[in-house]
Amino acid sequence: MSRRTCSDLRRPSSCPCRLGARTTVDGCKEESPVLSVTMKCFNCNPDLSELEVVKPEDSGIEASYSPVCLEPSCNDCVRNHERLSFIDSPIVGHDNKENQRVQNTLDSSNETEELEASRLYEDSGYSSFTQSDRDDGILILENFRNSPQARLLPSQSPDQHPNKTLLPVLHFERVVCSTLKKNGKRNPKVDREMLKEVIASGNFRLQNIIGKKMGLEHLDILAELSRRGFVHLLANILTKLSGMDLVNLSKVSRIWKKILENNKGAFQLYSKTMQRVIESSKLSLHATTRGYVVGRAALTCVQKSSTWAPPKKDVQIKSSSQRGQRVSTYSRHNEFVEVAKTLKNNESLKACVRCNFPAKYDHYLERAVCKRESCQFEYCTKCLCAYHNNKDCLNGKILKASCKVGPLPGTKKSKKNLQRL
């Protein structure tokens, strides 16, 4: 086995190792009575067979492991050197089980370290993209620091100006959280007035955020477009509408009418149709109920059947009498309901003989009293005359009862009837 030092091997120009430099691993010199190894960088791509083992001249003097690499990029050299020297050393025997366990743990630790190191240097595409963004950002920062605008910005707070890289909502959240964090050290309570001042002073561009009106059943689209200043969209919508549609649009709300007035072309068409409708409404007698609506083709059959015609006198009298009867029946019904709420157990309701309004009827006394304030007639239910207590009816005409009342229970007649049965 030829003895050659690491300096005798051919090295590429990119090798970071320094020739002839010999240091100990981890900056400390440890001496061993076994052997000494002179190591070269494995990343230089020579054959591994050129690694030589140098026996010490004096066996009593401890040798040192001296890898030649000094750069931090040659950590692989040091790890491989330690592993090879540990395997080749005579201390680690094949028959020694304890040493084999130590060797297995070293192998597993080296494999995990190699995997972690390889993951660090992997390029998935995102790292190169972020690296280019960082380089661009560094160049922009250098140019910005040299510019005169960089002197003005330190006086201004960064929270007042919107961050263009963030969404408006995220920028708003960041500003609010930063203000709460600053003031939370002084006062644990939330100062709402201070938050309102911060929100009013900052330009957060929250007015154009999409999705604020999601979930609502009713939404005024034209009002939202006018509030956000989309005049071109409103003009495009109004050009698609006809004259009568514009007339109906102006009746919806004041906001829609203002939108119509702001558009010149649509407002001219609206004014022309309004003049035409007013002229036609003067000629028609039915303009009071129909309004400005002109006859449409879709409802012509319905409009023909519902056209207005002057009613005859007889028909008008009958309709007025029927309406009066409906009103009277409705009012009488309400009166009966109100009086029925005040009835006792032995009382019932009857219509008054004079005014047909509700009257309280007592079955045992055969008396009825009208509850109308203007009437209050008290009469006998047999002869329908003024009530006469226990006296016989004056006219002698007793009205036949609608239903015959049987004998009272416990009387002789009722007992005889029971005996017959």
UniProtKB/Swiss-Prot annotation:
Locate the region Inhibits APC ubiquitin ligase activity.
280-421
The yes or no answer to whether the keyword Zinc is present is yes
Q: Where is this region: Allows a rapid multiple mono-ubiquitination of the APC substrate, but strongly inhibits the slow ubiquitin chain elongation catalyzed by UBCH10?
A: 352-394
Segments forming ZBR-type zinc fingers: 348-396
Cite the F-box domain residue spans from the record: 223-273
Summarize where Zn(2+) 2 binds, as residue positions. 380, 383, 388, 393
Q: Which GO terms describe its cellular component?
A: cytoplasm; meiotic spindle; nucleoplasm; nucleus; spindle
Transmembrane ranges, per UniProt, are none
The pathway that the record names for this protein is: Protein modification; protein ubiquitination
**What is one GO biological process annotated to this record?**
negative regulation of cellular senescence
Q: Which PANTHER family match?
A: F-BOX ONLY PROTEIN 5, F-BOX ONLY PROTEIN 5 AND 43
Q: What is the protein's name according to its record?
A: F-box only protein 5
